[in-house]
Amino acid sequence: MSLPHCPKCNSEYTYEDNGMYICPECAYEWNDAEPAQESDELIVKDANGNLLADGDSVTIIKDLKVKGSSSMLKIGTKVKNIRLVEGDHNIDCKIDGFGPMKLKSEFVKKN
């Protein structure tokens, strides 16, 4: 019997363990009986683990240096109407007094 290829990384080196298929290359586990769930939905969590969504308001929880500027974003700065994007800095927003910015979700908390 031939084992199925990994649905995540397409590796041929998979093995079966207790009814689950496991890929040693990407550590993906799946059951052939249930359909593979692929979600295009972007999941972003704040510093406290709360799910963030487009349009949310957040507060900065740490003083952040702004690259290319001598000023800083102070703790407690409120940011309204965020937009979630792919990438390392996964929050796109406009901050009063600074203009457009990209922030990391680990430095904000949901209001």
UniProtKB/Swiss-Prot annotation:
It holds the Pfam family Zn_Ribbon_YjdM. It comes from the Bacteria. Disruption phenotype: No effect on phosphonate metabolism in B strains. GO terms for cellular component: cytosol. InterPro entries: YjdM, YjdM_C, YjdM_N. Belongs to the YjdM family. This is Protein YjdM.
